[in-house]
Amino acid sequence: MTQPTEPIEFAVSADQITERFSGGSTLPSAVLETLRAICATSVENESLANHGRDWWPLAMHWALQGKTPRKPGAVCAPSTTDQVAALVAVCNTHDLPLTVAGGRSGVCGSAVPLYGGIVLDVTSLQGIVSVDEVSGIVEVLPGTFGPDFENELQSKYSLTVGHFPQSFDISTVGGWVACRGAGQYSTRYGKIEDMVVGLEVVLANGDVVRTGGAPASAIGPDLTSLFVGSEGTLGVITKVWLRAHPVAQFQARASYVFPSFIDGVNACRDSVRNGATPAVLRLYDQTESQRSHGLDGTQCTLLVLDEGDERLVKATLDIVRESAIQNRGTVGDVELVEKWLHHRNDTSGLQALTRKGYIVDTMEVSAPWSKLESIFNGVRTAFMSAPGLSLIHI
């Protein structure tokens, strides 16, 4: 099974790694013994250092200086919901800070245990528990990595959830839910909150609750939505029920070139408003289109991919084509879609640039169609006021 991928090497051996934010992380021996009686618990230098970071760009630079942001006092790896509940109860009793971690693929430092305490590593909670093939609902454990999840779901059940974030190869189902992620196929399948049917969650006092489970409810607040996107602040997710779809039997692709970014935005908007929701509708700005697609630096590229029923896919691509042409688009190189599929999750460039001293960061914003042009221009101008390269896509 897949294990966490560390972002970059440390410049020193494990016993020489220091903390960027110090504060003391040693736990009392009695507490450690209690934790060890519950589940696998590590205080090894390498484990503490790795669980003190994620893919935060600044932390990658600190690693090359022999530093990790902040070490926990221990790393606990429960393999059952009961063990998670017992760990959380111990932290509650002893007033210990608790940070939940999975693949640690985030780029914002949110998996860093800033207050020490323990890191609860959910990656021992792996695998598909059950599949309701009639209803299209899959029960899966939170520490299951994207490739393991989709490979088993597709090969054994001919189903897919359709959630493919850029971090797919190195992130977990629990992380997708806790961080309310969006995948690269979200125009067709929705974001993760559209896929979650129910959750099992351990609360801060160790109690276990189950939310959702029914197709819909007309009574009371939606408790599931409270935990989706809560990033571990309200509880520890220990099981997830997700909607699944039959693996697509037909796929079609297209590419278009626009004289300006706003022309491409308008084409995307018109496509969606006319009922076309292709799995991938990905527009690149002039800089990224030149760098990745070989254009002249003034044009923008739109990549399109859809899958599913052949009739629906063809109709969808027809609507996108009409919208593109009506907004000054011309047909581009469809092979660019295949190139994107092959390289879309590659992180090797990030590590290589970091080793050369560059800061490589990412940010995302959401806005109504009416404000996209002003946001695009504002963000681009702000970034280009400093030396560097800015690449934008929607």
Regions of interest found by a model, annotated:
Residues 94, 156-157, 327, 386:
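Helix C-cap/helix->beta junction micro-motif
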Residues 45-61, 246, 252-392:
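C-terminal substrate-recognition/cap domain of FAD-linked oxidoreductases
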Residues 1-89, 106-136, 286-293, 336-362, ...:
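N-terminal flexible segment immediately upstream of the FAD-binding catalytic core
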Residues 102-105, 166, 283-286:
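Short, ordered loop/turn segments at secondary-structure junctions
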Residues 127-282:
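FAD-binding subdomain of flavoenzyme oxidoreductases
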Residues 36, 92, 154-155, 272, ...:
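Anion (oxyanion) recognition and catalysis
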